[in-house]
């Protein structure tokens, strides 16, 4: 039994920057690198195992061929995706469909997601919901381009958390570094892209009708995270919903853990330490991402670290 440390793809974006390199030391393809798909089995960017007996396997292959590592799940598709996003400019104002709409129209799951704010510049903000009271008002404000009248802006700071269910109008603003936990989907409907053009002089495609089909009325409710503290561990349940549960762990010393989920997706956001599994010691550092599979029933971590950890739930 051993952890699965991962090597994962980068994605360049019109709104990306270089903080994936400056903050985490990752090799990036350009100064417009927007996303690191840190734990992914999605065909648009698959993680590879880089250690142990499964070194060289990609995650989708391992999930299909070795289901026992994941608790013999009912689903044939790895359900979650962990990303780090570096927003050097506004992302498009967008929305994601739910599972029913996504499967019918795009052939893949919808996307419910959540954001942990790793860092944010002073004055940074996101778009989180909208002000329209009816579908008719929503369509009218979009058609008129009355974005100030439509969009709900929310200031953010380091350590904030936001739950973004499917159907939520949203956008991430410049100066924000985010860890995103989401359903494994790459379907995005753009409502507004700030009229910008790519390096070829073209505006990016918008998806107004699809957006109107799936947008929710009203703003999402962002629950208050619950924290449990011991001497060496501060464990905060950021969200638990029908798709996933996400925790933030702040460790300051030696902590023993027992597996209470089929498997865990783990990301080290700061600090360093060691993890011991079956008498084997693994070094942990900022920027590491790994899976603790089903056969890892207990382990200990020693060090000063902040981590975000998640597991899937039955939808």
Feature map (PLM): residue ranges:
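C-terminal amphipathic alpha-helical segment
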Residues: 189-254, 260
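His/acidic/aromatic-lined binding-pocket segments of jelly-roll/cupin-type domains
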Residues: 82-83, 91, 113-116, 153-154, ...
């Amino acid at each position: 039994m051993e952890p699965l440390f991962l090597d994962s793809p980068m994605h360049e974006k019109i709104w990306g920057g270089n903080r994936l390199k400056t903050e985490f030391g990752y090799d990036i393809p350009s100064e417009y690198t927007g996303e690191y798909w840190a734990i992914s089995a999605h065909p648009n960017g698959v993680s590879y195992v880089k250690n142990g007996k499964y070194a060289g396997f990609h995650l989708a292959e391992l999930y299909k061929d070795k289901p026992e590592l994941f608790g013999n799940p009912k689903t044939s598709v790895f359900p979650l995706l962990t990303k780090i996003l570096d927003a050097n400019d506004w992302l498009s104002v967008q929305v994601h469909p739910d599972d029913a709409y996504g499967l019918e129209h795009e052939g893949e799951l919808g996307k419910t997601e959540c954001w942990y704010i790793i860092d944010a510049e002073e004055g940074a903000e996101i778009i989180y919901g909208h002000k329209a009271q009816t579908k008719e008002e929503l369509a009218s404000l979009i058609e008129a381009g009355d974005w100030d009248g439509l969009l709900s802006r929310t200031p953010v700071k380091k350590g904030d958390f936001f739950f973004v269910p499917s159907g939520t109008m949203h956008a991430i603003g410049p100066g924000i570094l985010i860890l995103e936990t989401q359903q494994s989907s790459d379907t995005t409907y753009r409502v507004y892209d700030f009229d910008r053009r790519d390096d070829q002089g073209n505006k990016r495609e918008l998806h107004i009708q699809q957006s109107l089909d799936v947008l929710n009325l009203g703003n999402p409710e962002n629950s208050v995270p619950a924290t449990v503290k011991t001497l060496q561990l501060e464990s905060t349940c950021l969200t638990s919903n029908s798709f996933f549960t996400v925790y933030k762990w702040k460790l300051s010393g030696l902590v023993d853990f027992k597996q209470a989920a089929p498997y865990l997706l783990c990301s080290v956001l700061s600090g360093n330490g060691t993890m011991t599994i079956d008498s084997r010691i693994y070094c942990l550092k900022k920027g590491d991402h790994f899976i603790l599979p089903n056969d890892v029933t207990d382990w200990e971590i020693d060090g000063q670290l902040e981590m975000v950890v998640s597991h899937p739930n039955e939808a």
